[in-house]
Swiss-Prot record:
Gene that encodes it: CBR1
Compartment annotation: Cytoplasm
Name of the protein: Carbonyl reductase [NADPH] 1
EC number per UniProt: 1.1.1.184, 1.1.1.196, 1.1.1.197, 1.1.1.71
Chief location bin: cytoplasm
Residue list for modification N6-1-carboxyethyl lysine: K239
Length: 277
């Protein structure tokens, strides 16, 4: 076990913003960088691409929808490094605007990965985070827009400083159920499934940061959600304003906050600035 070596890990690291984050961490992080991807072939191809640039990330398979896959990664990190220093939860999906898939199916599929998959990764890997560790959950400005489109009752719940993880899970499940019944708008939900899943990611980040402050107060772990901006990726398309490299800036900034930093913690960060939630 090479537990003296620091290690950073990025989910969904084989393309787009994830790949740009891995590239930056390989250059700036003093330790090993693990690129994870659902598809082994694509993940290893991304590693080879970075190796051709003179960088040396490691690869490990990870499908955030598969608990066994998450646990295999957890065991690898524990055995190889005795824990984890930096976790960047970047993996996520979105349907294209013109996608003909029925809305309730889009809601269920997007929620499964973006919220529940990310939550499962946190459940398994947060206990491994070492003192002065950094956790970055890549959310979206769409979460802020979706929040503003929620009913006042839902907004109040999502902004609550005391909402529990169980309550948040209940709300995320309710959204999916409401879409199946065709009553989501009547129930105060916005019509962006992606936006609601990212509300989930942002609020989950606030909850986990609060728990870390309560349960591991002296460990100086900082956990935040962030928006990378509108980035030219397979997800956002070619018209977006930022390159993947520019999209990686805020996540990497949060991943590399100096050891003595007091914050940000439990915040939603965009363009390296704390945004009001």
């Amino acid at each position: 076990m090479s537990s003296g070596i620091h290690v950073a890990l990025v989910t969904g690291g084989n393309k787009g913003i994830g790949l740009a984050i891995v590239r930056d961490l390989c250059r700036l992080f003093s330790g090993d960088v693990v690129l994870t991807a659902r598809d082994v072939t694509r993940g290893q191809a991304a590693v080879q691409q970075l190796q051709a640039e003179g960088l040396s990330p490691r690869f490990h398979q990870l499908d955030i929808d598969d608990l066994q896959s998450i646990r295999a990664l957890r065991d690898f990190l524990r055995k190889e490094y005795g824990g984890l220093d930096v976790l960047v939860n970047n993996a996520g999906i979105a349907f294209k605007v013109a996608d003909p898939t029925p809305f309730h199916i889009q809601a269920e599929v997007t929620m499964k990965t973006n919220f529940f998959g990310t939550r499962d990764v946190c459940t398994e890997l947060l206990p491994l985070i070492k003192p002065q560790g950094r956790v970055v959950n890549v959310s979206s400005i769409m979460s802020v827009r979706a929040l503003k489109s929620c009913s006042p009752e839902l907004q109040q719940k999502f902004r609550s400083e005391t909402i529990t993880e169980e309550e948040l899970v209940g709300l995320m499940n309710k959204f999916v159920e409401d879409t199946k019944k065709g009553v989501h708008q009547k129930e105060g939900w916005p019509s962006s499934a992606y936006g609601v899943t990212k509300i989930g990611v942002t609020v989950l980040s606030r909850i986990h940061a609060r728990k870390l402050s309560e349960q591991r107060k002296g460990d100086k772990i900082l956990l935040n959600a962030c928006c990378p901006g509108w980035v030219r990726t397979d997800m956002a398309g070619p018209k977006a304003t930022k390159s993947p490299e520019e999209g990686a800036e805020t996540p990497v900034y949060l991943a590399l906050l100096p050891p003595d930093a007091e914050g940000p913690h439990g915040q939603f960060v965009s363009e390296k600035r704390v945004e009001q939630w």
